[in-house]
């Protein structure tokens, strides 16, 4: 592969220091779309990951049953009804980066949410596609928008999206599939692989203690937040992915399993430690 994300590589990428005269509008306007009536935890983890990663303004479009929990667990985020198309259109227009998928569900409502987003997203925006949204993309096979698109599949989701069975997912076949797809891909696995248009990277840190539900939602939120804050997409994706595994590996030294909510709490401390 093209290179390895190690601490040395991250040092050259770095997490930028915040400017003294900055304000919340300088750190990304984020929209998260997901969380069906039964899967609200996924979008909540993603939202909290955005908050703890430093996003300036966060809006969550989710099922009304999740609103009270979000207000309680993530008061920093604004919350709107995912079914309110007028408000959703307004928020899409105001947003820099959009994450769709965590807890979205794969029924017709999820299909409709993706179709609506693709009709309204603009070329200057960033789109991060995770979880259920990847499954829906695999079924609908819509034309990708002209904005910058990042997919964050685990191995089974990548099988659906690429058509490559898990046991046949070699680097060469994955690279060919990414080229056909025409997007950035963060393939979540032991030794996560990141595919860009012109080069690829393999993560060399992490821990099996991170193999728990919600960890991918957390990573998707971090990637969305970093991409919304930092100008260079490649550096943002690599920095978010590295930081996620960096925290997990460190926590695993003292914890048998690393809950995503615990990892989220450590994000700002790790970012400070890795700050340029």
Swiss-Prot record:
Disulfide cysteine pairs (residue numbers): none
Cofactor list: Mg(2+)
GO molecular function, one term: ATP binding
Membrane-crossing residue ranges in chain numbering: none
Catalytic activities: (6S)-NADHX + ADP = AMP + phosphate + NADH + H(+); (6S)-NADPHX + ADP = AMP + phosphate + NADPH + H(+)
EC numbers: 4.2.1.136
Keywords: ATP-binding, Lyase, NAD, NADP, Nucleotide-binding
Organism domain of life: Bacteria
Binding residue positions for AMP: 216
Residues that coordinate or bind (6S)-NADPHX: 42, 105, 154, 217
Enzyme superclass (EC): lyase
One Gene Ontology term from the biological process aspect of the record: nicotinamide nucleotide metabolic process
Pfam family of the protein (one): Carb_kinase
Residue span, YjeF C-terminal domain: 7-274
Subunit-level organization: Homotetramer.
Family: Belongs to the NnrD/CARKD family.
Free-text function comment from the UniProt entry: Catalyzes the dehydration of the S-form of NAD(P)HX at the expense of ADP, which is converted to AMP. Together with NAD(P)HX epimerase, which catalyzes the epimerization of the S- and R-forms, the enzyme allows the repair of both epimers of NAD(P)HX, a damaged form of NAD(P)H that is a result of enzymatic or heat-dependent hydration.
Entries under PANTHER family matching the protein: ATP-DEPENDENT (S)-NAD(P)H-HYDRATE DEHYDRATASE (PTHR12592:SF0), ATP-DEPENDENT (S)-NAD(P)H-HYDRATE DEHYDRATASE FAMILY MEMBER (PTHR12592)
Stated name of the protein: ADP-dependent (S)-NAD(P)H-hydrate dehydratase
Species annotation: Staphylococcus aureus (strain NCTC 8325 / PS 47)
Gene behind this protein: nnrD
């Amino acid at each position: 592969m093209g290179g390895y994300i190690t601490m040395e590589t991250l040092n050259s990428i770095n997490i930028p220091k915040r400017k003294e005269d900055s304000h919340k509008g300088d750190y990304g306007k984020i929209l998260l779309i997901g969380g069906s009536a039964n899967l609200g935890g996924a979008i909540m983890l993603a939202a909290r990951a955005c908050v703890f990663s430093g996003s300036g303004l966060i809006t969550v479009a989710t099922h009304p049953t999740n609103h009270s929990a979000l207000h309680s667990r993530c008061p920093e985020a604004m919350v709107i009804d995912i079914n309110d198309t007028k408000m959703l259109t307004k928020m899409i227009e105001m947003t820099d980066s959009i994450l769709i998928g965590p807890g979205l569900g794969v029924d017709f409502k999820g299909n409709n949410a993706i179709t609506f987003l693709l009709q309204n997203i603009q070329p200057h925006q960033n789109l991060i596609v995770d979880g259920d949204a990847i499954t829906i993309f695999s079924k609908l096979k819509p034309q990708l928008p002209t904005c910058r698109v990042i997919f964050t599949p685990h191995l089974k989701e990548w099988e659906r999206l690429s058509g490559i069975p898990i046991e046949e997912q070699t680097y060469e076949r994955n690279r060919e599939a990414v080229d056909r797809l025409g997007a950035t891909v963060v393939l979540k696995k032991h030794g996560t692989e990141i595919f860009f248009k012109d080069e690829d990277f393999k993560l060399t840190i992490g821990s099996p203690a991170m193999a728990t539900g919600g960890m991918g939602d957390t990573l998707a939120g971090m990637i969305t937040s970093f991409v919304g804050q930092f100008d260079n997409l490649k550096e943002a994706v690599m920095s978010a992915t590295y930081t996620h595994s960096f925290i997990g590996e460190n926590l695993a030294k003292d914890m048998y399993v690393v809950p995503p909510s615990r990892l989220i709490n450590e994000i700002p401390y790790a970012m400070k430690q890795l700050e340029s």
